[in-house]
A protein has these predicted regions:
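Sec-dependent bacterial lipoprotein signal peptides
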Residues: 1-17
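Short loop/turn and low-complexity linker motifs enriched in small/turn-promoting residues
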Residues: 16-140
């Protein structure tokens, strides 16, 4: 591989691996955790579309967070009695909660059958608010 391409690739990959800067004491950080075989992305913050994968650091107060959660569900019976491949299901989950300055929070989600279950947790992992399912299906 030519050195220029190798250097460019190294710089590109190292930019993705940068740790987040320390959280200022007057802001709130919300991380996303979807576990394995699933994907969670920031969708809306206080009604406004988020154009990043995660939420920006927020001022303290009450916020409405929405995430797009995509997870695998088992396939059904295909033709000739064979099991079909697992399918991806996409849902929008909403959480409204009071966030305190200087704190780290995490939105977690998992699937329970065909339905998602999500929570807002504090830094210690204590569940604070259960997420509501806003909608699921194609085009979400």
């Amino acid at each position: 591989m030519p050195p220029r391409i190798l250097l460019s690739l190294t710089l590109l990959l190292s930019a993705c691996a940068q740790p987040l800067p320390p959280l200022p004491a007057d802001l709130v950080r919300v991380a996303l955790d979807s576990g394995t075989r699933a994907d969670m992305r920031a969708y809306r913050l206080d009604g406004e579309l988020v154009r990043q994968l995660r939420f920006p650091d927020l001022p303290p107060g009450t916020h409405e967070l929405q995430v797009r959660y995509q997870f695998e569900v088992p396939g059904g019976m295909g033709g000739l009695g064979q099991l079909s491949e697992p399918r991806r299901r996409t849902c929008i989950l909403g959480i409204e909660g009071e966030l305190s300055a200087g704190e780290h929070y995490r939105v977690t989600a998992y699937r329970l059958g065909w339905q998602p279950v999500g929570y807002l947790e504090d830094a210690a992992g204590e569940r604070l608010v259960r997420a509501s399912v806003i909608r699921c299906g194609p085009g979400v």
